[in-house]
Amino acid sequence: PDLPQQDLIATHPNWTRADFNRAVFLLSGRLKTANVQTAALWFDDAALFACAVLAVWHSGGRVLLLPNLARDNLDWGRTADVFLTDSEDLQSKLGSQTEQRDEFGQPLDVQSNPPVWHLPDLPAHTSPENSPPAPENHLIPNHAEAWLKTSGSSGEAQVIVKTAAQMQAEALMLAGALPFGRGGETVIGSVIPQHLYGFTFRFALALTMGWPMERRQAVY
């Protein structure tokens, strides 16, 4: 909140830091109200992913980052209190039959356990007029955790735990090694944001350096 509020967090479509922060705090408040301690994440949009991670962390929870939608990973995700996603694929994989709407007017999966919060239009509900005031404490706890699961493509899948402090330290180390400054470079990723490299480059490095994110994965 202390950084330039009209700078872009993401492109295509554009998302300013002011609107991004409002979305983080709005979702954080909703997670606190629902007493969510752990959220499983599956996103195509890197900016919505970043918003969800920060919201869970700000609310005092931890995130489980699914490497793909294979059955064993969905079972791992079911150990969380809620799924957060922008993907219709997740809902279909979980086998939901009935759709209701949450307070954002978005589809809410009421049959799966845990529930699925489908958040592709969250930014549309975070205008200054509709958003609650920013909380007094907007800091992310250093000990906030992200649990990443490797795909298992090179052996048995493993769970790696990263803290917010570790991710920031990694991002600062990378920033010192890369020949770029803070001149508005855009981060484009060829892996999903839930991937270990995606989490480092598309999330931590982009936010630490203030570089806008290209929302969609660049598949090649």
Predicted features by range, described:
Residues 169-186, 194-220:
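Conserved AMP-binding/adenylation subdomain of ANL enzymes
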Residues 14-17, 137, 143-172:
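Conserved AMP-binding A3 loop
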Residues 52-60, 167, 202-207:
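Short hydrophobic alpha-helical segments of the AMP-binding
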Residues 1-4, 116, 120-149, 180-187:
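Conserved pre-ATP/AMP-binding loop-to-beta segment of ANL
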Residues 2-33, 45-46, 162-165:
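Conserved AMP-binding/adenylate-forming core of the ANL superfamily
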Residues 91-118, 122-133:
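Intrinsically disordered, low-complexity terminal tails and inter-domain linkers enriched
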Residues 29-69, 185-193:
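Conserved AMP-binding/adenylate-forming
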Residues 44, 64-77, 211-220:
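ATP-dependent adenylate-forming carboxylate-activation enzymes
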